[in-house]
């Protein structure tokens, strides 16, 4: 008999009786149109695309079964929130300081115990409205355990509240179980086929879908704070000099201007595209070019000051260390100035770099685990894309 965790019965009781009561209230609050599905067999790995911070609630409203969420450690930074989540849901926490093997093995052990696991396959909310990179190890996990696989797709979530947005737009969100691949089906599939099915089922391009649906997502200030995602000027090619107000975006270094409409599309006489995914492809190339063209390794390529720099300790608690920190990108390194000291590390030596919330950069080195938040909108992706490029990877 498989041994279950001590509080498994309590948590399962909460989910069985409380979730169905709260789900209709949640759906009305977020404009979510659910399509309830009761799994035909267990255990399973439930994977979803990630469009919004409310996605776990959307998944829970659609799939009537108990499962353990995989959560990033930034969600659990507050001890109060961490204890509440552990009481009602027992999430599997993916700590940034750990290697990917740790969370993989935790999911593996959980599934082998017969307990379902839910995972946001992209690992973070989409920046662009298009489904991003999905790790192949998710397919490896399914094949190693021999469990079922449920693919759950969310549409409308990104345009309801784009990653940069300060306000939620009025518009519908939909969820659906695309397919439940049973254990028997998984046994007949290769790892490649499982991975291809996962990527296919979860793919969403919010802009291409809305080009057909023409659904309005209305906000008073639809462009406000888009600097969290948009950093490359389509006209002069500078990085980190874009600003927004109301429905407008402009560049400090030239006369570039753009506006965004109620359907989420961007318009300017100086750019060939009208969607964030296309804009993002362009601006990533600006970062690559900036690094390639730099000749002095000590030349600051991009810099942001007035950063809130915190340190995460071994318990997962976060402590503010400096309210006036600085983050810098160089040709082959990244630097954080904080609390009278400098943490500068070669991109190739960075243990892990991540991006959470709207603009928090997570930086793990051999010596420290930092969280760099910002007082004013700025794109964390500048540093993420830059460091990954130093490591030899172009960010998808």
Regions found by a protein language model. Give the residues of each.
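A broadly conserved sequence feature marking short terminus-proximal activation segments
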Residues: 172-232, 237-239, 369-386
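Cys/His-rich short segments
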Residues: 218-271
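Anionic N-terminal interaction surfaces
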Residues: 268-326
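Phosphoinositide-dependent membrane-docking surfaces
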Residues: 46, 327-360
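Short hydrophobic/aromatic-rich beta-strand segments that constitute the beta-sheet cores
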Residues: 69, 260, 334-338, 363
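Short, surface-exposed charged micro-motifs
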Residues: 241, 257, 324-326, 352
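Acidic, Ser/Thr- and proline-rich intrinsically disordered linker/docking segments
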Residues: 347-396
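Soluble catalytic domains of membrane acyltransferases
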Residues: 2-196, 212-213, 220, 235-236, ...
């Amino acid at each position: 008999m498989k041994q279950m965790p001590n509080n498994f019965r309590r948590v399962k009781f909460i989910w069985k009786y409380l979730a169905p009561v709260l789900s209709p209230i949640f759906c009305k609050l977020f404009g979510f149109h659910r399509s309830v599905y009761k799994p035909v067999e267990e255990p399973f790995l439930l994977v979803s695309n990630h469009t919004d911070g409310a996605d776990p609630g959307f998944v829970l409203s659609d799939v009537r079964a108990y499962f353990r969420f995989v959560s990033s450690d930034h969600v659990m930074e507050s001890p109060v929130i961490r204890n509440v989540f552990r009481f009602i849901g027992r999430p599997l926490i993916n700590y940034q300081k750990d290697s990917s093997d740790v969370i993989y093995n935790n999911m593996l052990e959980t599934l082998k115990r017969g307990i379902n696991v839910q995972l946001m396959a992209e690992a973070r909310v989409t920046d662009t409205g298009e489904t991003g990179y999905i790790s192949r190890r998710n397919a490896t996990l399914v094949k190693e355990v021999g469990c079922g696989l449920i693919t759950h797709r969310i549409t409308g979530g990104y345009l309801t509240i784009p990653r940069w947005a300060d306000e939620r737009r009025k518009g519908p969100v939909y969820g659906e179980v695309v397919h439940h691949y049973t254990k028997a089906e998984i046994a007949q599939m290769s790892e490649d086929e499982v991975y291809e099915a996962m990527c296919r089922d979860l793919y969403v391009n919010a802009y291409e879908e809305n080009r057909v649906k023409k659904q309005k997502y209305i906000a008073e200030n639809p462009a406000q704070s888009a600097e969290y995602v948009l950093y490359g000027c389509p006209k002069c090619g500078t990085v980190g000099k874009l600003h927004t107000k109301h429905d407008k975006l402009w560049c400090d270094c030239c006369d570039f201007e753009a506006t965004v409409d109620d359907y989420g599309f961007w318009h300017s006489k100086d750019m060939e595209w009208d969607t964030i995914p296309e804009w993002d492809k362009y601006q990533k190339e600006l970062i690559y070019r900036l690094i390639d063209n730099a000749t002095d390794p000590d030349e600051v390529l991009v810099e942001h000051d007035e950063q809130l720099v915190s340190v995460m300790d071994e318990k997962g608690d976060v402590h503010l260390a400096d309210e006036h920190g600085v983050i810098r990108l160089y040709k082959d390194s990244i630097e954080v100035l904080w609390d009278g000291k400098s943490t500068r590390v070669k991109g190739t030596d960075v243990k892990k770099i991540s991006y959470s919330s709207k603009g928090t950069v997570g930086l793990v080195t051999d010596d420290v685990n930092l969280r760099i938040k910002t007082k004013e909108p700025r794109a964390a992706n500048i540093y993420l894309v830059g460091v990954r490029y130093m490591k030899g990877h172009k960010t998808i």
